[in-house]
């Protein structure tokens, strides 16, 4: 018999250092994620943050949830959960454990859930159980500034995957002689690795998307990352470690007055612009070359249509080549109906758990 157990903030605290946790064959959450989930300003004391599936005393699977809020134009707020992690042990496949975890989450969050960054097989499962509808995907552009064949080729053919270390050596050999093609602007900017009053005062006055990120959420994102550059979580299948990782705000000024800011993450030379607030989006586009050069960025991924259009129009960022793809979203039928047919979702690149991975 499969039993589903849910952990809220209080129950999750100290879980990764408990004796029970140490006995698991696989880790259902990392230490950093535990701390971050508990600190989430949008998680209530009653929210279930981690669902565990047991058969007897044996852990068979888990589902991690990131609580959030979304608001209609009239101000009505709906509390919901983003799916963050879902795993079932290979030893226990075929017992409908994933479905049981999904139904437990659906009940705990009153049918209000969303999912992104899922595999095709997971998409099939989510659709099969009948709880979810597809949302319009976000179109993405990945800009390559250096040779990154070790990232591109292994996904195309197994022969490249087997020889990945040699392809990586080729990348390292050729990249020093490949120049950055973009020209840096003369815009005045500063970098903030920590939340400050200037950012708080500026962002709290800006127009937000329906998830209405405020200074509390942005401070949390900066202060409680999920990735460590020191150690990897043992027996954990999701992101917990990166050889290099930074997150920071870029602040742009005119006449010493803050006019634009955007939140960046750089993981292993891969730049993402997670959130931005700007009076003129072209300022972000022309400031990016300086960030790309100063942080030795190899590639950049942007899911924001407006920013991608500005980059294409302004030609401020010049790439060796580009790849086009999309990010899919699922929403429970219940939440979709509550928000209404005319609701504009307008997800930022960092919404969901994307700011942390």
Set out the residue ranges of the language-model regions.
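An N-terminal, globular interaction/scaffold subdomain
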Residues: 41-43, 49, 63-76, 111
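Conserved acetyl-CoA binding element of GNAT-fold acetyltransferases
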Residues: 77-90, 267-279
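Active-site/acyl-donor-binding loops of N-acyltransferases
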Residues: 112-168, 224-225, 234-240, 247-248, ...
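Conserved acetyl-CoA-binding loop-helix of GNAT-fold acetyltransferases
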Residues: 88-108, 280-293
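Amide-forming acyltransferase catalytic core, primarily the GNAT-like/NAT-type
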Residues: 5-8, 12-55, 134-266
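Conserved GNAT-family N-acetyltransferase fold
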Residues: 51, 61-63, 81, 86, ...
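Extreme N-terminal starter segment of soluble prokaryotic enzymes
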Residues: 1-3
